[in-house]
Amino acid sequence: MSSLSKEAELVHQALLARGLETPLRKPELDAETRKTRIQAHMTEVMHLLNLDLTDDSLADTPRRIAKMYVDEIFSGLDYENFPKITLIQNKMKVDEMVTVRDITLTSTCEHHFVTIDGKATVAYIPKDSVIGLSKINRIVQFFAQRPQVQERLTQQILLALQTLLGTNNVAVSIDAVHYCVKARGIRDATSATTTTSLGGLFKSSQNTRQEFLRAVRHHG
């Protein structure tokens, strides 16, 4: 992790200190080598499923999956992909809640490697800095691009923003459909899971907490 940005390193260390980091091994192979290895293993998996990889529809599937894993849906495992963060001095002395609603996220259940599909609402009360609004979306997407459990994902986003913004006054709520529930097992096609993580005033002040929860419930 020698080439990490300062912000990526701060967030990674904060998550480690709190026991909230995704279980990770120290990286040993570069991205291209990992893709080559994954492609070989996926070829074997497909053979074991009795799929005919000489068919032109399936022939390139192992390579596609390997590229998708490393470059896309699991790209958040590599902190070199942590978004560039823009912080602006809070010269306007903004001290009211800033909320970004309906942030689209797609993640992967770490137990079955199937889709988690949902939306996040993130709020914070600025202290010394404000953050570019799109950066909140990018932070959500970074941590979603990993094998995840929703509870940890919610807390990772919270702690990352607390670390970057220098304030505990952050709140995160995620509402998501888990395809490990929808497409297998119980096969419940209508249920969704909501997780919330609150810090600072969002936890200690009932009024602030209720204002955030109203924003989460607002759809009009």
Swiss-Prot record:
What's the catalysed reaction? Answer: GTP + H2O = 7,8-dihydroneopterin 3'-triphosphate + formate + H(+)
Please verify whether the record's keywords include Metal-binding: yes
- InterPro entries, A to Z: GTP-CH-I_C/QueF, GTP-CH-I_N, GTP_CycHdrlase_I, GTP_CycHdrlase_I_CS, GTP_CycHdrlase_I_dom
Segments spanning the bilayer are: none
Q: Which Enzyme Commission number(s) are listed?
A: 3.5.4.16
- What does the entry give for GO biological process? one-carbon metabolic process; tetrahydrobiopterin biosynthetic process; tetrahydrofolate biosynthetic process
Task: Note whether Glycosyltransferase occurs among the keywords.
Answer: no
Q: From the UniProt record, give the pathway where this protein acts.
A: Cofactor biosynthesis; 7,8-dihydroneopterin triphosphate biosynthesis; 7,8-dihydroneopterin triphosphate from GTP: step 1/1
User: Keyword set for this entry?
Assistant: GTP-binding, Hydrolase, Metal-binding, Nucleotide-binding, One-carbon metabolism, Zinc
Q: Which Cys pairs does UniProt list as disulfide-bonded?
A: none
> Which positions are annotated as binding Zn(2+)?
109, 112, 180
For molecular function, the Gene Ontology terms on record are: GTP binding; GTP cyclohydrolase I activity; zinc ion binding
GO CC, sorted alphabetically, is: cytoplasm
Question: Which NCBIfam families does this one have?
Answer: folE, PRK09347.1-1, PRK09347.1-2, PRK09347.1-3
PANTHER family, per database record: GTP CYCLOHYDROLASE 1, GTP CYCLOHYDROLASE I
Similarity-based family = Belongs to the GTP cyclohydrolase I family.
Subunit comment: Toroid-shaped homodecamer, composed of two pentamers of five dimers.
Annotated protein name in UniProt:
GTP cyclohydrolase 1
Q: Which gene encodes it?
A: folE
